């Protein structure tokens, strides 16, 4: 299984993650060209080789016109206001709605936009909790800067390019002490970072500084499936993303890209099932909650008709998610449904090793989802690709589907 491992012994920040992932890709110039043309006026992203404690790595530098952007939490707020095609970045205060509008207009894939927005939702929820206000009232400070947006979008672009089947991270070193932000000096980890990192293993060691920023924490929480020591894997590439500050220990986030193997005789996955009974919500309200949970990255959400006390017709809402995200989804369910309690069940799951192939057909490119394991091989064309191809070519769904199934490449036949 293609696996990405993040070693967070010196924490995590957006620029460190971008640099560490960039070292894993073959065409670095192509990424720089892409990130510099996403549609943020005046944005310039450069990579530079640096050496810390005798180890060579990459540092990402972001500039906006004449100002140099900093991705760490204590960055100075840039004073420039950029306007282009109705896209405006006011660096001192940027609302979540404005962040949504900015990302929606960027020249990146929809998958990158969705991932970036999900990361910002994690940050917005954390900031709202820390300040005791609603998400709608949140005004980002440094995190609303164009350089912070570039960090988050850059990581999403690189993750789409690398396409790991599984992403694992070590426990995260958060640092200690206090850090200066727009509201004054706050403890490390910051309230927002601490909120995001709930249910994730963290520790403090080696530095009296902030090592994990809200941006770094949110990116990791969004993409990482498991938190543990490095698994048994055949490493193919290693990346070093260097931080700005110098410490006694090398200030870097290290990435490993390689292959891991699961024994077909063992259970290879663990998930959490969150459930509650609902008998006093409208269908529209339940549908809204389901869409929100799926939008935030739940693995699956569904309802089953049930009958409750006093013979009331009701639904059983089930949300399936990764174990480390259970607290996050439980809070969403409590906030957006009428339930007073949620049942949590930890489930071991048998899962096939998955990957995605792309097939060229008469109707365009179609992605094919494949699964292998337990002496079983399966493949299935992606519904969205077939539906879009059918619409664009004015043919039936079955015609496109048959074209994929009846003309498999040699690689697909082996699956």
From Swiss-Prot:
Keyword Metal-binding listed:
no
Gene3D superfamilies reported in the protein's UniProt record: Transcriptional regulatory protein pf0864 domain like
| A Pfam family matched in the record | Ni_insertion
Q: In its keyword annotation, does this UniProt entry include Plastid?
A: no
Record's InterPro entries?
Answer: Ni_insertion
UniProt keywords (A-Z) are: Nickel
Entry GO MF terms: lyase activity; nickel cation binding
What does the sequence similarity comment in the record state about its family? Belongs to the LarC family.
Q: What is this protein called?
A: Putative nickel insertion protein
